[in-house]
Amino acid sequence: MNTNNNFSNGEEVSIHIGTGIDIAAKAWGPKESSQKMLALHGWLDNANTFDFIAPILAEKGIRIIAIDFIGHGLSPHKPSWCNLYYTDYITQVLDVAEALQWKTFSIMGHSMGAGIASIVAASMPHLVERIICLDFIGILSKEQDQIKAIQFAMQTRTTINNRKPHLYNNKQAIFDKLKANNPWIKDEAGQRLLDRSIESVISPTTGEQCYKLRHDPRLVGPSIFIMREAEVLLMLDEIQCPVLLIWGTTSSQQFQIKKNWTQIMEGRMSHIKNLKQLVVPGSHHFHMENTSAFSQDILEFMFEEKDLSFTPSSTTQQQQQQQQSAENKKGDNHNQIAEQDLSTSNTSSPIISKPKPNL
């Protein structure tokens, strides 16, 4: 494994999972750390969403792997004959953890990623040590006629599959569209997300270079199966690990999926046994705006009730090895499973074209 010690940019890695797919990801922090964390991005976002907070956590000794969900970022799309289900993201998380040989781990998720973290923690409590939910908890729910929902999804399936991608003459045009749809996103944050979301192509009509979004267009289609709110609450009842939920002060105004959104979130929080809640200045993407407002809270949450202390960024490799040896002598090595080598990759080309790593 070729190591990139630049905590700010992270290390580009490719993770070959059991289904034969290479998942694109970014890594920060020491591989030998006892603190393992998977970072899950939101809908239509990508691993770059953690570029601001991950380096801070990594400098304190936390190993962080931020993945691109299938159909997002640099990860491949599912075949056209496959339908998309939110449960696929759950299996992706478990497949990645298995490929990394992590016996237990924590999860940090933003928006949809926080929802997936909730389900994984509820369904596999023996694997998840703690979860950090950024601006969301649980998953989207809807009181709908399931048969009609399936009918509508099937009726629109062909149209979405045959839809040609929109081509843009330059990157600025895509950025302008992003800002128009999400005016709260800061310029630097929006640009960071787009760096991993667009690719250069040749226009079939003009033969000139242009740009398109990488994400699977089916992601904007209707969902076939959506939980009812009562089912979401039953799921949240099953979460056994500590939960840190962080909200942005203005996100509720920007993220009004339902009129009674605040009441729904309050109801969900009442079903979580071990919950800590924090409100910080910022929008729905507050984790890309002002990390100093909450990074210390995450660190305290990650290290609380454990015989662990922060690892200074200046800690040498020898000191880390000595600390590792001492922990192993205590017999607390349940989470010291070393990751096998992950292949380095280049963000300028799709991960689907890269050779598979030896995991």
Swiss-Prot record:
Presence of the UniProt keyword Hydrolase in the record: yes
Keywords recorded for this protein, A-Z: Hydrolase
Top enzyme class: hydrolase
EC number: 3.1.-.-
Cellular component GO terms, alphabetical: membrane
GO molecular function: hydrolase activity
Biological role stated in the UniProt entry: Probable serine hydrolase.
Similarity comment: family membership: Belongs to the AB hydrolase superfamily.
Name this protein carries in UniProt: Serine hydrolase-like protein DDB_G0286239
